[in-house]
Regions:
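Active-site anion-handling motifs in enzyme catalytic cores
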Residues: 1-337
Length: 337
């Protein structure tokens, strides 16, 4: 089964969570007899690169990795770009499937396009409910960072507090400030630092402005830790007594490693939706950044036995669901429409 993946997020500035997603997604495909023959990155519009597309006769399945792209489609072109892959598949007589996606606050036009997909799999029940409101059914399988077991246990020795960043830059700066104030370590979810765009690209004022903003953000809340591999980030998270974060994939890694955490919501309610599915409710959600992170704060946020039991059950269910999903979508590739 020859699979073409679109919205490959592994090149996303060394984003640890996206790296794990892609590793696990490819592993799932291979474990169920598929072969990835083509990968298209998240930051390029496939519609304007026809000369870079594969020979479609050599592709049996188009798999779209939704992640956090499909939200606010009326104002965000990236959501519609992915949704239009359904029509491409129809024109080439290749099944198209959406996996590992959040759906939030999208317009009717996006769901009309998703209706051309052969199947939809979303990361939480809230996303499935939005799809149903537009007449579409979607299976629910939690994020691909959770698709395989990680060899850590809740009983391992832990020490200190770790802070990560947020998709909201102002929140990242405040988290970095609190980490310094608390004597804690701060690690962004990305492994790379802003690079000078090069002399050819400085002719573009927009590129220079983008680099300058990234450079100033790095100066404002640069990392105490920055790892070269996602596995190192997982180990860092798993070594802490508490993580304070504004990142969805930091929360999934906290679940994976059973590391206590509190969070500030991301650019959509995807963290809250995930944790409601786990059974943890909203108890770990912060509405404001705390003024202090002391021993009393840390102690009251340690997982209870009931919470650990819910996380364990959720992880087992997610892994089983991920394998069922992989098997189902690869069976679709066996018969072209």
């Amino acid at each position: 089964m020859r699979v073409a993946i679109f919205n490959d997020t592994e090149p996303d500035a060394g984003h640890y969570g996206c790296a794990i997603v892609m590793q696990n997604l490819i592993r799932l495909i291979e474990d169920h007899g598929g072969t990835v023959v083509f990968r298209w990155p998240f930051n390029k519009d496939w519609r304007t690169h026809a000369d870079h597309m594969p020979d479609w006769r050599e592709v049996d399945l188009i798999l779209v990795n939704g992640e956090g792209t499909l939200h606010h489609s009326d104002t965000r072109k990236n959501a519609m770009i992915l949704a239009e892959l359904g029509a491409l598949g129809r024109s080439q007589h290749i099944p198209v499937v959406l996996v590992n996606s959040t759906l939030y606050a999208n317009g009717k036009a996006l769901y009309e396009r998703l209706g051309q997909f052969h199947s939809l799999s979303v990361r939480d029940e809230a996303s499935a409910a939005e799809a149903r409101s537009f007449g579409l059914e979607a299976a629910v399988v939690a994020d691909m960072t959770l698709a395989y077991e990680w060899p850590l246990s809740a009983e391992r020795d832990r020490s200190g507090v770790g802070f990560t960043d947020s998709v909201h830059h102002s929140v990242s700066a405040r988290l970095r400030s609190l980490a310094r104030q608390s004597g804690a370590s701060f690690c962004p979810m990305v492994s790379t630092v802003p690079r000078w765009p090069g002399f050819r690209k400085i002719l573009s004022i927009a590129r220079v402005r983008k680099w300058l903003r990234a450079y100033l953000r790095e100066k404002t809340y640069g990392a105490d830790n920055r790892f070269s591999a996602a596995e190192q980030f997982i180990e860092w998270v798993g070594s802490k007594r508490l993580i304070v974060t504004g990142r969805y994939h930091t929360v999934t890694i906290c679940l994976l490693t059973k590391t206590p955490f509190v969070y500030l919501e991301s650019n959509t309610p995807k963290i809250t939706s995930l944790l409601r599915d786990v059974g943890l409710g909203d108890s770990r959600k912060l509405t404001n950044i705390p003024s202090v992170v002391d021993e009393a704060f840390i102690s009251q946020l340690q997982f209870t036995e009931q919470e650990i039991s819910k996380i364990d059950a959720f992880l087992v269910s997610t892994r089983a669901g991920a394998h069922r999903m992989a098997e189902a979508v690869l069976q679709q590739s066996a018969v072209r429409p």
